[in-house]
């Protein structure tokens, strides 16, 4: 019996010590460092409106249905973060073809002036997460005609807006140039006022 207690005692102490270290101390230290070094990222990269209200995150896309605004990628989960993920069909899957055809049909309804052959792939296909907040600068540019007609904002102004909101590859190496749709639409909204 004494032998069991002598073995159990250090096991309980070690378990309790690691529980406190890994479950309390480590998370508090990491959170403190994150808040001190990169507060914006640690808080979720939130985007605020003029009234200082949170309207979204630059990391999670939103669905814009008003044709006066730029539209992002297709999302099979309607940009619901709790349902992150997408039906990543194989190129040989007929369901992928149906989904892309449906996206193209919806695109044609709002963008009659743009030939389907000029529609960038990111406007008719899902991202892996279904939450992608960015589109390519080309995907933003093909929407300029529609937005210009509906808002009476010149194409030159809209193209400059896209250029101003275009972000380069991460660290100059990873990924491609991209435009955050929410941030772009916020700048567009300022012009609409």
Curated annotation (Swiss-Prot):
Name the HAMAP family on file: KdpC
Instruction: Give start-end ranges for the coiled-coil region(s).
Output: none
Which organism's genome codes for this protein? Bacillus cereus (strain G9842)
Give the function comment from the record.
Answer: Part of the high-affinity ATP-driven potassium transport (or Kdp) system, which catalyzes the hydrolysis of ATP coupled with the electrogenic transport of potassium into the cytoplasm. This subunit acts as a catalytic chaperone that increases the ATP-binding affinity of the ATP-hydrolyzing subunit KdpB by the formation of a transient KdpB/KdpC/ATP ternary complex.
Ordered alphabetically, the record's keywords are: ATP-binding, Cell membrane, Ion transport, Membrane, Nucleotide-binding, Potassium, Potassium transport, Transmembrane, Transmembrane helix, Transport
Name the principal localization, coarsely classed: membrane
Indicate where this protein resides in the cell: Cell membrane
Membrane topology according to the record = Single-pass membrane protein
The GO terms describing molecular function are: ATP binding; P-type potassium transmembrane transporter activity
Q: By what name is this protein known? A: Potassium-transporting ATPase KdpC subunit
Record-level GO cellular component terms: plasma membrane
Q: Where do transmembrane segments lie in this chain?
A: 14-34
Oligomeric and partner information: The system is composed of three essential subunits: KdpA, KdpB and KdpC.
Q: Name one Pfam family in it.
A: KdpC
Assigned protein family: Belongs to the KdpC family.
